[in-house]
Amino acid sequence: MITNDLGIYIHIPFCVRKCPYCGFLSAPPESESQIGLYVDALVREIGMAGSAYGPGRQADTVFVGGGTPSVLEPGQIQKIFGALRDSFTITGDPEITIEANPGTLTKEKLKAFRDCGINRLSMGVQSLDDDILARLGRIHRKRDVFSCYKMARDAGFENINLDLMFGLAGQSRKIWEKTLDEALALEPEHLSFYSLQIEEGTPFYDLYKAGRLDEASDEEERRMHHMAISAAEAAGLVHYEISNSAKSGRQCRHNLKYWSMEEYLGLGLGAHSYLRRVDLSEDACEEEKGADEFNRAEEKSAADAAGYSDITGCRGIRYNNEEDMAGYLGSIARGALPVDGKSAAADTEKDAMGIYVFTALRKRSGVDLEDFRRCFGKGFFQAFPQAEAHVARWQEQGLAEIITDTGSSVPGPAETKEEKSRSSSPAETKEGGYFRLTEKGIDKSNDIMSEFV
C-alpha cells in the first residue's frame, strides 16, 4: 500500500579506495578538505530542500548510502543529522540506516551514529573469505567483520544488515556456503545477497571485455542464490525480496519504498528522487542545468495530480542531482538546489503502471491487485490485456501465481465477459489478491518483469 510518508536518501560519494567492480558514483576524496567542503554543501542543500519539499511532509525512513558513509568523522555525521532534523519532520518511529565498511568503523563513530538516532547499520561484508576480499579490492578482512559487528552490538544496534556477494571469481559453492553459515551465525536481523554485476567503466569490465575475468555460469549463480535463500530461512530470516531476507518486522522499510513506488527525496551528489508533489520556485533549478526541462516535467506532473482525489494514486516526477562535484558545489554556493533539470521526466500512465509491476514483482508478496486498481483506476488485466496469456502460461509452468488475500490460489485470469469488464481476474473481483512470482519463477524474474516495461 502506497503511503504519504517520505523516504530520504543522503549520498556520501567518498570511499577509502574504489573497488574494481563498483559502478556507483563514488571515489576517494581528492584532498583532505574535500570531504569537509562537501558536508558543508550537503548541510546547505538539506536546509534548502527542507524549505522546498519539507512543509507539510514527514519522513519515516532515512538512508545514508555511498560510497562509504562511515569514512565521515563523528562531527560530520552529527552536522548532517542536525540539519536534517532542523529541516524535515521525522516520524516518531523512523528507520534510519547508514552503510558502513568494516574497515572504517570505530567505537567513536558507532556511538556518534547512535547519538544521531541512526538505528540500522548496513555492513558491506561481501565475503568472509580473505582471498576473495583481496580480489574484490576490499579494504577489510574477515576478522574486521567480526570485531566491528561486536562493536556495533555493544553500541546498541539492534538492527543490522550484512551485504554479501556471490558469483565471484574463485568462489566455489563450498566457500559461499561457509560465508553464509558464518554470517548467519552472527544472527543479523537482515541479509542481502547480490550476484556480481559487471558495470561498464570499471576495471572488472575491462577484464571482462579482455576475456580475463572468471565468471560464474548463470546456472551456478542460480544455485548460489537459492543457497542463500535456504540458509537464511533456516536461520529464521524470511525471503521477502529477490535479494533480501529478514527477521519478522525487520524488512528494510526504506528500500521497500523503491519497490512500492513510494516517494523518496535524494540529497547529495547525483542522488535520485521520485516525488508526486513537486512545486519548486523558479530558481530551484538553474537555467544552465536544465530549468526549462525541469519546469515542463513539473507542470506535467502537477496537471496529472489535479485529476486525482488521492495523491498517492497519481504519477510522479523522476530526476537526479548534479553528478559533477564542481557543478554540485557551485549550484549550492549560488543558493540553488543542485538539480539536474535535464534528467527530469514525468511518468506517463504507461510508465507508471509498468514500473509499479516491475518493482512489485521483486517482492515476494508481488503485485497488490487492489492497490493497483486504486492507483490507476483499472484492473491489472485491463491495464495489461496482453498479460492474460503470459500469466496463464507462467502459472502452468509454476513460475507465477495469483492468490487471494486469504492465501488461496486462483487458477488463472478470468474467462467471463462480466469478470473481464470489471477486472479480468478472480483475485481482483473479490477482496483483492496478489500476482507474484513463485520461488521457481524468481530464476526467470528478468524475463517475466520485462513483459511489463
Language model feature labels by segment:
Residues 13-26:
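Local cysteine-cluster metal-coordination motifs and their immediate loop/turn environment
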Residues 306, 414, 425-427:
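Short, low-complexity intrinsically disordered segments enriched in A/P/G/S/L with frequent Arg
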Residues 408-412, 421-424:
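Ser/Thr/Pro-rich low-complexity tandem-repeat tracts
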Residues 439-453:
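Short, amphipathic alpha-helical interaction segments positioned at domain boundaries
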